[in-house]
Amino acid sequence: MGNRRDLGQPRAGLCLLLAALQLLPGTQADPVDVLKALGVQGGQAGVPEGPGFCPQRTPEGDRAFRIGQASTLGIPTWELFPEGHFPENFSLLITLRGQPANQSVLLSIYDERGARQLGLALGPALGLLGDPFRPLPQQVNLTDGRWHRVAVSIDGEMVTLVADCEAQPPVLGHGPRFISIAGLTVLGTQDLGEKTFEGDIQELLISPDPQAAFQACERYLPDCDNLAPAATVAPQGEPETPRPRRKGKGKGRKKGRGRKGKGRKKNKEIWTSSPPPDSAENQTSTDIPKTETPAPNLPPTPTPLVVTSTVTTGLNATILERSLDPDSGTELGTLETKAAREDEEGDDSTMGPDFRAAEYPSRTQFQIFPGAGEKGAKGEPAVIEKGQQFEGPPGAPGPQGVVGPSGPPGPPGFPGDPGPPGPAGLPGIPGIDGIRGPPGTVIMMPFQFAGGSFKGPPVSFQQAQAQAVLQQTQLSMKGPPGPVGLTGRPGPVGLPGHPGLKGEEGAEGPQGPRGLQGPHGPPGRVGKMGRPGADGARGLPGDTGPKGDRGFDGLPGLPGEKGQRGDFGHVGQPGPPGEDGERGAEGPPGPTGQAGEPGPRGLLGPRGSPGPTGRPGVTGIDGAPGAKGNVGPPGEPGPPGQQGNHGSQGLPGPQGLIGTPGEKGPPGNPGIPGLPGSDGPLGHPGHEGPTGEKGAQGPPGSAGPPGYPGPRGVKGTSGNRGLQGEKGEKGEDGFPGFKGDVGLKGDQGKPGAPGPRGEDGPEGPKGQAGQAGEEGPPGSAGEKGKLGVPGLPGYPGRPGPKGSIGFPGPLGPIGEKGKSGKTGQPGLEGERGPPGSRGERGQPGATGQPGPKGDVGQDGAPGIPGEKGLPGLQGPPGFPGPKGPPGHQGKDGRPGHPGQRGELGFQGQTGPPGPAGVLGPQGKTGEVGPLGERGPPGPPGPPGEQGLPGLEGREGAKGELGPPGPLGKEGPAGLRGFPGPKGGPGDPGPTGLKGDKGPPGPVGANGSPGERGPLGPAGGIGLPGQSGSEGPVGPAGKKGSRGERGPPGPTGKDGIPGPLGPLGPPGAAGPSGEEGDKGDVGAPGHKGSKGDKGDAGPPGQPGIRGPAGHPGPPGADGAQGRRGPPGLFGQKGDDGVRGFVGVIGPPGLQGLPGPPGEKGEVGDVGSMGPHGAPGPRGPQGPTGSEGTPGLPGGVGQPGAVGEKGERGDAGDPGPPGAPGIPGPKGDIGEKGDSGPSGAAGPPGKKGPPGEDGAKGSVGPTGLPGDLGPPGDPGVSGIDGSPGEKGDPGDVGGPGPPGASGEPGAPGPPGKRGPSGHMGREGREGEKGAKGEPGPDGPPGRTGPMGARGPPGRVGPEGLRGIPGPVGEPGLLGAPGQMGPPGPLGPSGLPGLKGDTGPKGEKGHIGLIGLIGPPGEAGEKGDQGLPGVQGPPGPKGDPGPPGPIGSLGHPGPPGVAGPLGQKGSKGSPGSMGPRGDTGPAGPPGPPGAPAELHGLRRRRRFVPVPLPVVEGGLEEVLASLTSLSLELEQLRRPPGTAERPGLVCHELHRNHPHLPDGEYWIDPNQGCARDSFRVFCNFTAGGETCLYPDKKFEIVKLASWSKEKPGGWYSTFRRGKKFSYVDADGSPVNVVQLNFLKLLSATARQNFTYSCQNAAAWLDEATGDYSHSARFLGTNGEELSFNQTTAATVSVPQDGCRLRKGQTKTLFEFSSSRAGFLPLWDVAATDFGQTNQKFGFELGPVCFSS
């Protein structure tokens, strides 16, 4: 389960894959030369060669090979071990010189899964890599740039290192380990996180003898004064090839104008292909020497997989001259090229002092070895981890000091040794994986298959044949030039050079003592902007600046503490009807009402469920004999027929026993290429082939149907530059690029403009105190800054010093209404004053509390189209496409030689239109079109909202009292105000006295339901009243006139805030007051409660289009829209910035069928095929003649109860019924529950004054109350000067209530008084008795729609109403906000080919890839030979009845049938005419003597012609055809909405030729109305696939900071359990899903887990699965790494195991029984930290039977 590839702890070392080579010839103790097996020593791998460990060793000196990052060599391990196993105990023998570096890997052995089994890492610590190995102790650094001889002995559990002929202490290992040879052996490593060994290597041997490591310096790696060891044995009996000598004394000719090399004389020579002196071909000749080694029966030498950088010149290298040096007599040769390259400037023969170019006469490429080559490409930047320190660039030179005194002359020094190499630079970060390459070329192996009785070829011939085909196809396998890779890593540090000539004069002596201070130097250049200094001390307060702009509104303060309860106020007047309260508890069911009038007839209801089986009906009377029936069904099969003709050839029989091997036959001719075989196992990386030549352009083919999107193709070649396209939309910002290497220092640039201030860096070390600078000139005053954004509320500051007295402030607003004062002395009764004039309109009240949620407003007109939304996320992987059909068999042709590259052909003519394609997926919704022309001016809009109130006006001068105006008429009722906020529950009123029983009032007309008031506190239980008799229905009374105004009551408590009044006009600006002192910072208030949503305002006119807003937060996933029509081809956009290569995506599901292949050439005439199936159904025949009416049928059985009909439309209201008779008096009911509080009653009579309470303590500051409504104008007062606050006066005695005074003249508005103290909470009043029922109130307003009642009984069917008229289009709405990114749309049409992108950089070597998808269809082959006639196919499905055939020839007369039954006696015919008298007969025979018998009546056969039927037979056949077609669709449904299938597997079994697509199924086989549409994957055998809901298809990456790790996603605030939909986006019925699971045997589903710095399955840092995710199936079972179920999970890609960056992990679930899938929930465990995120993509679930 999952990806078990365990790489162990990440080490900074490279694995040494020890290709344990078993040697065919030789003994078991002979070591295996790995370098020779890899082709390094033979020169096939193209690895540079140079001097080795002992260059002076006789006879020819040691030679070594330079390997590095670009020399990743590999070979299949099984080729190294033909006997089939790796030695259990062995030794590693190595001679190398490594470059100074960190840990690096020299050799690695991988198994068939790509996991490393064994490796050797070199560096400061040498170690064997792999599960059972550990680092080995060593006393010497093996990567210090010097030659070392290293040997490692692995003997059982003991591992011993021998470094430079000195054995180190052994290390106890983990025991022997089995090493598989089914993988790959690589010189270096294939892991991108590790570094490949860089340096020179001379020997790399593997000996099956563990003691060989202790004899390394004597037998295999001797000292320089000893001879070289004997040649080792290569694997598989590879013949020994004499190593080419690299030494000579001749001088190469100088043919080009290249620069002359600077190497030593003995290293200037160019190696030639001359044989050794003792060779048989050591003679003067102009022929190229060849070395032929006979290998009659040996298999071919394994060719190593080489990945090198080669330079192909395209020129044939030929030896033109060979001569003998007269001095030494040795053979000398030079290489020249036929092409004239003298004029090329860069033809340089200087490649370095020790490594040269190896030139091969038979190959057209030069392999350039490292040396003093050209400057390499720019490497990728190194990533500086936190905590690392690097030396910065050198600073500017300091001032020149005074010349010190000359020191004494030192003794002459010895020539110094070469210095140690400098430290290596940090390795660059690994590059991003390159684009996945195209599928490789398929080689057709022409094996002959045994057929009939012919003898098959032997195995050796097949191998020879395969080898010949491989050689012939190598020329044609050259692929096109691949894309240029990414820039490589920085090149390795070169090898230290040989000791140079005598050095120049030595360096200066030590620095002398510090001289005197020199004179001031010239002023320096303006330095770079320094870091911002630390904040200085707080300056003195400046002068008062100009008054700034009005700041932003501050943040709302926290609510204050709760105040004490106020005194109980008097009962106020009944308020307006409140808003609808919450729905109360459901009351008891009322008494059953009388049956209403029957409603109108409803529509036909839905079909009901089948009723119970009825009783058997009465046996009917036998009916009259029926008419002659139709033709009956075919009879039973007859007896066996006669012997038939000879049949066709049968199927091949079972395979017989294997015969004895025959004698080897002569080689046959090349056979016909066979059919393509099945996909083989994963191959190893092949050689990088040379670039092939481009073929000629073929003729244009016919346009095929539009195919489904294929995999991402290789970047195309550069096309002709098109016309200038329109400017495209701005692309998204790309990823930040890596920092490049430091370039060469440029010239001094001009001083740039000062840049923006950078971010504060870390505080640096304190510098030395500098000299005091000169005082600069005072700067000019800066401009006034713009208004800043209000900052967050700061911490309370310390109280500042008291400021000076400010200017008088502006007049403050009217203060809040003060607390109720104590009862004053009774005033004198004043005279009734004249009615005052109408007061000025009051100031607008403060904004009330948010009212209850209003009704939904009308839909606004469609807004201006918003900007184009961001593109949606990538959809989940699609289903894997089906395997294409096999192509036509081609003719047997021999591959020709590759032709010359043809010129670019002309563009072909447009081909004929192709056949109609398969219905493609619906395209994406097209982009919003351009803004249309300006329309006509719209209708006048609604009046705008009232403007903001103006500034407060100054207090006007007191006007004279005007004359009393006439009494105005009673104005009309005002408009209904906005509903006020919900009032609190009222205090219980005083206990009232029980009233007398009132007379029964008249019954008023039914009023509209009133608005439901708020739920008040429960009242006291009243005395039970007597039930009154029910009075007759009386008419509604008229509204009474307004009563006289009563005497003013006592001052009440602050009332409930009234409804919000209309906004008043803006007042005049008030005078500016003095600026007051700054108050102390108040305590933060509590957070206020959230108000309800207000009513929607009327739609305003659309405003002008504003600027594009910032992208909003991701919205909730919307409902899946209908697929729109495919959009038009967009115009070509500008070239985008080249993005980084993404990570390898998860393998997609099976794709849809590909397009049909090209039409093949006409084949040869085939043999006669079998008889075809019956033809298609013919056209309908002419209508037959009308038949005679049949006899009435017998009484049928009662039919089944029909299904329940659909609910009919509501009928028209019936006429009102007659008033009912008053019902009898009911029984006394049980005591009911306490009813809801009634509306507030009228104010009671004033009670006696209560006793004065004690003075309460000052309460805490209460919450700021809402501004009350404007009060009535008060009496005119005299403006008094505000006096000081007096001491509280003594409480006076209660005075008698004064007489009601008349309202005085309106006085000027008084000033706001100080706030009074909070009073103490009053005592709770006594509970009053229940009052008498008041008179019926006026009918209330129509209330809102009540809650949905229980479903009523099904009424009779009503008449369908007339469709209403189409409504008028609404007004244009305001422009909508930019919507969230839409769901993933269907694949659009392919865009135009883009311009050639920038040249990419060379990428790193990738891992061994997975098996690629099937390649594209190859070129059209030649016509093949006619194939062998195949066996007869299975019997086809019966086709529909064919057309009526023409009248056939009359058949032979049939056999006389049996005697029929005697017919009924016919009616006597009429008397015929008398016939003529016949002739006299001959005399009869003599009679018998016995008694006479009656003569028998003989029948005679008289042929009577049958009547001809005209047209009737065709009508009968048409009816039979229609019936048979319907029966066939019932038996084998086609998967339509009317005839849904059971599951997709059944559809595939009944219709095997159906293409993949969406079909209707009905798993529970009930009514077809609950069928649903699914995707059927017939390519996979008929899988039924359901899609997940759009909400779970892509859950974006999020930190989920408020969620708990390990919890199910359904418990998250935004989460819920997974759900699945059909192809139309509708949820799948649970019952149907259960039936689908019952009908399925297996199920599979993909789940992609997106992560950021988090693990999803394996945690590679700890090596365990403690952070693995858990999954919940629909059967309630849980699946994780520790909990297994019937379902299995595999993890083919686990990118989250490293817990670094953003990546993905792909889970593939499969279940042998479909109970676990689909998935219901997921629980992530690794999140919660600040840099961790996770999301997921839920794939479709597919069931198969």
Curated annotation (Swiss-Prot):
Prolines at the third position of the tripeptide repeating unit (G-X-Y) are hydroxylated in some or all of the chains. Residues 62-224 form the Laminin G-like domain. It holds the Pfam family COLFI. One of its GO terms (molecular function) is extracellular matrix structural constituent. Detected in fibroblasts (at protein level). Detected in urine (at protein level). Residues 230-304, 322-362, 387-439, 476-1492 are annotated as: Disordered. Residues 244-267 have a biased composition (Basic residues). Residues 211-391 are annotated as: Nonhelical region. Residues 426-439, 489-499, 597-619, 765-792, 967-979, 1116-1126, 1141-1152, 1234-1243, 1405-1416, 1458-1479 have a biased composition (Low complexity). Disulfide bonds join 1585-1742, 1651-1696. Residues 391-440, 482-538, 824-877, 905-950, 951-989, 1430-1488 form the Collagen-like domain. One of its GO terms (biological process) is cell-matrix adhesion. It is found in: Secreted, Extracellular space, Extracellular matrix; Secreted. Residues 1514-1744 form the Fibrillar collagen NC1 domain. Type V collagen is a member of group I collagen (fibrillar forming collagen). It is a minor connective tissue component of nearly ubiquitous distribution. Type V collagen binds to DNA, heparan sulfate, thrombospondin, heparin, and insulin. Trimers of two alpha 1(V) and one alpha 2(V) chains in most tissues and trimers of one alpha 1(V), one alpha 2(V), and one alpha 3(V) chains in placenta. Belongs to the fibrillar collagen family. This is Collagen alpha-3(V) chain. It comes from Homo sapiens (Human).
